[in-house]
């Protein structure tokens, strides 16, 4: 006589269990999202909101050592207060993955290492203010002219290091950081003719650039060009994925 009642109670119990499971899963997702949000810097969150992606989510094998998150750069100061990740527009990130794959095909013992990625225009202004009245002004794009490709998420400052180098050795501090890069003749960020790729034959002839370093630069350009990047004449480490005119016409400046 109690079977209908028992069946009804079972249904109610099952519905309650399902409801509790759904609510629990929802809270789990919310908690997980909150934890991730707390672990991602404010600048990184702002970049993601502008459609940029963390290169590690596209290719975790590419090494990162942002030079402007340290003081050993040409300004001798830390410009990125909280940013430690390398962000790019998806198209640029995909191209970097292709470049890394090409390098691995040629030299499995090596890896690309990123020294600067997307750069907010506010940081660009700080850099421009430091060089605008010096002989080095042409190394930094003037924000009033729309900035450079770093400000659009379509450029990278990059080199090559040993694949065995441990990223955990890189820390955001004023102390010197040893990065196992292959020799390129100058450090990344060197403002001088030794960094100019159109001067390399002369540098080689004069013994300023060794054959090994000349070939290392050529290797970097080879893998980057294979992925669609164009080198910058005055900086062996800088590569653009599009022209300034195209970026200004089709993209938004990263703030």
Task: Give residue spans per PLM region.
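Short, well-ordered surface patches within globular domains
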Residues: 123
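Conserved metal-phosphate-binding beta-hairpin within the catalytic cores
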Residues: 239
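Segments that shape or occlude catalytic/ligand-binding pockets
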Residues: 120
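Bacterial Sec-dependent N-terminal signal peptides
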Residues: 2-34
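Extracytoplasmic cell-surface/polysaccharide-interacting catalytic and binding patches
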Residues: 27-117, 127-130, 134-234, 244-255
């Amino acid at each position: 006589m109690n079977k209908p009642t028992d069946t009804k109670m079972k249904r109610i119990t099952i519905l309650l269990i399902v409801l509790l499971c759904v609510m629990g899963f929802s809270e789990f997702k919310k908690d997980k999202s909150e934890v991730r949000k707390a672990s991602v810097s404010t600048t990184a969150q702002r970049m993601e909101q502008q459609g940029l992606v963390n290169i590690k989510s596209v290719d975790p094998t590419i090494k990162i050592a942002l030079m402007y998150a340290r003081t050993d750069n040409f300004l001798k100061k830390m410009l990125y207060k909280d940013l430690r990740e390398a962000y790019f527009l998806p198209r640029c990130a995909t191209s970097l993955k292709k470049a890394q794959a090409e390098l691995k095909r040629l030299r499995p013992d090596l890896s690309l290492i990123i020294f600067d990625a997307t750069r907010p225009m506010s940081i660009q202004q700080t850099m421009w203010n430091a060089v605008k009245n010096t002989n080095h002004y042409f190394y930094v794009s003037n924000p009033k002219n729309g900035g450079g490709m770093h400000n659009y998420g379509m450029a990278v400052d990059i080199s090559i290091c040993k694949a065995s180098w441990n990223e955990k050795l890189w820390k955001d501090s004023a102390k010197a950081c040893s990065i196992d890069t292959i020799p390129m003749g100058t450090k990344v960020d060197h403002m001088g003719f030794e960094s100019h790729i159109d001067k390399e034959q002369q540098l080689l002839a004069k013994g300023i650039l060794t054959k090994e370093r000349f070939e290392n630069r050529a290797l970097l350009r080879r893998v980057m060009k294979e992925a669609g990047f164009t080198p910058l004449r005055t900086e062996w480490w800088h590569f653009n994925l599009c022209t300034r005119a195209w970026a200004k016409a089709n993209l938004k400046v990263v703030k």
